[in-house]
A protein has these predicted regions:
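Short flanking/linker segments adjacent to small metal-binding domains or redox-active Cys/His motifs
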Residues: 80-88, 124-128
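Extended aliphatic helical segments
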Residues: 9-11, 58-59, 72-75, 86, ...
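Short metal-coordination and nucleic-acid-contact micro-motifs, chiefly zinc-binding Cys/His arrays
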Residues: 19-22, 72-75, 101
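Short, structured motif recognition centered on aromatic/hydrophobic residues
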Residues: 23-27, 31-36, 74-77, 86
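Short, intrinsically disordered terminal segments enriched in charged and Pro/Gly residues
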Residues: 1-17, 93-128
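Short recognition patches in nucleic-acid-associated and regulatory proteins
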Residues: 1-13, 27, 31-68, 91-93, ...
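Mid-chain, well-packed structural core segment of small domains
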Residues: 68-72, 77-80
Length: 128
């Protein structure tokens, strides 16, 4: 079996999957967000931002072309270890956080162990 360094897969720009320990990891500082079988966002610092801070009004008045915070919220996710912004999502107020990355870890491990897939430079590739 490959070493732990070779069993880490880059999933997003700032998020890695450590396959042997089945954990989400910040690839900037190594902070562990939690189990890879759960939503990594639960391990992040969360900032619920007023959309008017990001999308400033274009004109004065009721119809300013700035999103209404009663209709939309901007949720920012940060690494507690280094402060890197890991993700952002736009949600209706009251909507639960999106569980947008769910990897079938057992199937992935099986395909790696069978030799069908390999990890090269933190990327999955088909075996040749």
């Amino acid at each position: 079996m490959a070493s732990n360094a070779n069993r880490r897969i880059r999933v997003t720009e700032y998020l890695d999957l450590e396959l042997d320990r089945e954990q989400w990891i910040c690839n900037r500082c190594g902070h562990i967000f939690g189990s890879a079988r759960d939503n990594y966002k639960k391990g992040c610092l969360i900032h619920d931002r007023d959309p008017r801070e990001i999308h400033l009004p274009i004109v004065e008045g009721d119809y300013s072309f700035s999103p209404d915070p009663l209709w939309v919220r901007i949720v920012e996710f940060y690494c507690p270890g280094c402060g890197t912004q890991v993700d952002t999502e736009y949600l209706p107020p009251g909507h639960p956080l999106t569980h947008d990355i769910e990897i079938d870890i057992d199937a992935l491990k099986s395909r790696l162990e069978s030799g069908e897939l390999v990890i090269k430079d933190q990327r999955l590739e088909a075996a040749q």
